[in-house]
C-alpha cells in the first residue's frame, strides 16, 4: 500500500516468500506505541541524499533476527488544527546498516514466545529512497499497522487468560488441603 514498486520488489517479495524476516520499530521507552510521543529523529542530509536516524526503540518483536525493519521517526513539525504537532515518517532500515545496533533481549512477563529486543540508531544513514510512503505520513502507517496487530495481541491475551483459568480450575479440583 505505501511502498514504491522498487521497494515492494526489493523487500516485500522476499518477506512474502519467507526468505527474509521483518520487524516494526515503533515502541519507545518514554512513549510506548504513542506515535506523537516519539523521540527517535530522522534528519535529511541533502549533501549525501540520506536520512540520518538517531534514537532507540524497545520491545521490538523479531528485533535481533529480522533482516528488514520499518522504523517510525520524527522528521519535523507540522501545524494541524491550529497547533504544532510532530511530523512522523516511516523508513525502511536493513540489518547491518552502519549505526544500527541491538540492545539486550527484553525481559517480559508474558508472550515470551517471541524474542523482543531494543533497536539503537546512532547516526544511522539510510538512503533517501528508503522513506516508506510520503514524508509526514508515518503516523498513518503506524496506525494502520497497529490496527491489524492489536486484534492479534488481544486474542493472545484472551487465550493466555483462558488457559490460566482452566489450569487453575483443574488444580483447585485436585488439590488436597487440611485432609480434604
Describe each region flagged by the PLM:
Residues 1-19, 61-68, 151:
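Internal helix-loop-helix
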Residues 4, 24, 42, 53-55, ...:
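Buried hydrophobic positions in well-ordered alpha/beta secondary-structure cores of metabolic enzymes
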Residues 30-33, 59-62, 81-83, 108-115:
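Short Gly/Pro-enriched turn/cap motifs at secondary-structure boundaries
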Amino acid at each position: 500500500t505505501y511502498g514504491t514498486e522498487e521497494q515492494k520488489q526489493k523487500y516485500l517479495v522476499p518477506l512474502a516468500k519467507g526468505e527474509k524476516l521483518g520487524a516494526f520499530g515503533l515502541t519507545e521507552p518514554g512513549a510506548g506505541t504513542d506515535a506523537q510521543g516519539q523521540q527517535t529523529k530522522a534528519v535529511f542530509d541533502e549533501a549525501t541524499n540520506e536520512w540520518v536516524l538517531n534514537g532507540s526503540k524497545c520491545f521490538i518483536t523479531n528485533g535481533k533476527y529480522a533482516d528488514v525493519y520499518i522504523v517510525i521517526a520524527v522528521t519535523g513539525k507540522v501545524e494541524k488544527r491550529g497547533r504544532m504537532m510532530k511530523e512522523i515518517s516511516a523508513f525502511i532500515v536493513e540489518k547491518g546498516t552502519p549505526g544500527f545496533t541491538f540492545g539486550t533481549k527484553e525481559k517480559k512477563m508474558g508472550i515470551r514466545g517471541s524474542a523482543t529486543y531494543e533497536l539503537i540508531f546512532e547516526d544511522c544513514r539510510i538512503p533517501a529512497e528508503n522513506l516508506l510512503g510520503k514524508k509526514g505520513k508515518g503516523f498513518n502507517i503506524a496506525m494502520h499497522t497497529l490496527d491489524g496487530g492489536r486484534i492479534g495481541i488481544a486474542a493472545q491475551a484472551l487465550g493466555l487468560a483462558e488457559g490460566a483459568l482452566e489450569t487453575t480450575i483443574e488444580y483447585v479440583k485436585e488439590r488436597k488441603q487440611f485432609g480434604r
